[in-house]
């Protein structure tokens, strides 16, 4: 089943380009059409139940929505206030996120500006992928793994089509709705909204494990390809139940990548020697067969992973292209039908 993109596509070089309108079977839902934003609420609409986490941007609380009665998640983000007040760019960027309405992206329901804090109200999900991986005794395989990755790539493509780059995809930023058997990307767009420098993104060492090599080498372009690399690392982790690359420093992370994929050269990655943190004295490792790292994946799965972990970000497979890969042939039609039902098609 061939599926087309309706209003935007991530090109091979990481740029975005418009495409002609497509037929009814489209990866990009009608939510791409700009929706009017609702007014923000006041803080007393939400009652805190408990603190459930603390991430790159602030504290996360489980809350009760006193208006709707539903359980929601509140991210409380402190803002740097200068003489001009709260930065309008942060509020504007976050407001754009409210237009996202996709079954595989955690929905931003409300934005509340309170004193020097921005309260972001999201749909509440009980568990993240990191927690599920810790609970499981076996890796994800077969149709289950295909469905998870297809859903994540659908969500990723939706956001890239809107020119949002996540920059911090990892298992703890992938939430799970077990009742509906879906996974959802969380925290999309917040890196751009709050201008968080990627090199000092978080004190969590684990974030390094999913970071693209061009970022580790000092590239500041932040193409959508950085998310595809991170998603490839998640893909491998699901298939093997442990991280593919697990360095405890930026240089150790690079060397972990080099030891499996080989030390990149101008022949394998044009322009790599010009990146700020490249060193001509890097150890020279020869690439190993990728299958040795992910023996549970079939040939199609290994091929998809290889394309997601392509060194050159301009040659790395895009989320859109990955969705067309033969690895997903047995689940694509069912998943696209689910997406179309969500869109009311």
Curated annotation (Swiss-Prot):
ATP binds at residues 52-60, 75. Residues 1-44 are annotated as: Disordered. It catalyses: L-seryl-[protein] + ATP = O-phospho-L-seryl-[protein] + ADP + H(+); L-threonyl-[protein] + ATP = O-phospho-L-threonyl-[protein] + ADP + H(+). GO terms for molecular function: ATP binding; cyclin binding; cyclin-dependent protein serine/threonine kinase activity; protein serine kinase activity. It is an enzyme of class 2 (transferase). It holds the Pfam family Pkinase. The active site is at 168 (proton acceptor). Phosphorylation at Ser-56 or Tyr-57 inactivates the enzyme. Residues 46-328 form the Protein kinase domain. One of its GO terms (cellular component) is cytoplasm. The keyword Zinc does not apply. It comes from the Eukaryota. Its EC number is 2.7.11.22. The modification Phosphoserine is found at residue 56. Keywords: ATP-binding, Kinase, Nucleotide-binding, Phosphoprotein, Serine/threonine-protein kinase, Transferase. One of its GO terms (biological process) is regulation of gene expression. Probably involved in the control of the cell cycle. Forms a stable but non-covalent complex with a regulatory subunit and with a cyclin. Belongs to the protein kinase superfamily. CMGC Ser/Thr protein kinase family. CDC2/CDKX subfamily. This is Cell division control protein 2 homolog 2. It comes from Trypanosoma brucei brucei. The gene is CRK2.
């Amino acid at each position: 089943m061939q599926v087309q993109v309706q209003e935007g596509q991530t090109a091979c070089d990481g740029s975005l380009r418009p495409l002609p309108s497509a037929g009814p079977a489209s990866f990009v839902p009608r939510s791409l059409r700009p929706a009017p934003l609702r007014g923000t609420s006041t803080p007393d609409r939400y009652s805190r139940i408990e603190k459930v986490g603390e991430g790159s941007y602030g504290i996360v609380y489980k809350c009760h929505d006193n208006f709707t009665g539903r359980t929601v998640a509140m991210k409380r983000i402190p803002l740097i206030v200068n003489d001009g007040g709260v930065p309008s760019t942060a509020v504007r960027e976050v407001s754009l996120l409210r237009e996202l309405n996709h079954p595989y992206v955690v929905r931003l329901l409300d934005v509340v500006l309170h004193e020097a804090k921005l309260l972001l109200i999201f749909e509440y999900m009980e568990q993240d992928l990191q927690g599920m991986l810790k609970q499981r005794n076996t890796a994800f395989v077969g149709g289950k793994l295909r469905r998870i990755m297809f859903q994540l790539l659908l969500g990723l493509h939706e956001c890239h089509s809107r020119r949002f780059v996540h920059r911090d995809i990892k298992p703890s930023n992938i939430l799970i709705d077990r009742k509906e058997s879906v996974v959802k990307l969380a925290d999309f767009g917040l890196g751009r909204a709050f201008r968080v420098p990627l090199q000092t993104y978080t004190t969590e060492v684990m974030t390094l494990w999913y970071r693209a090599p061009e970022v580790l080498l000092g590239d500041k372009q932040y193409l959508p390809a950085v998310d595809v690399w991170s998603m490839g690392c998640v893909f491998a982790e699901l298939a093997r139940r442990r991280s593919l690359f697990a360095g405890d420093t930026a240089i150790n992370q690079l060397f972990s990548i080099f030891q499996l994929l080989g030390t990149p050269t101008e022949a394998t990655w044009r322009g790599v020697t010009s990146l700020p943190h490249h060193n001509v004295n890097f150890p020279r490792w020869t690439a190993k067969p990728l299958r040795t790292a992910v023996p549970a994946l079939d040939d199609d799965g290994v091929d998809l992973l290889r394309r997601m972990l392509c060194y050159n970000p301009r040659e790395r497979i895009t989320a859109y292209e990955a969705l067309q890969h033969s690895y997903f042939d047995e689940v694509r039609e069912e998943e696209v039908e689910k997406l179309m039902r969500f869109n009311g098609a």
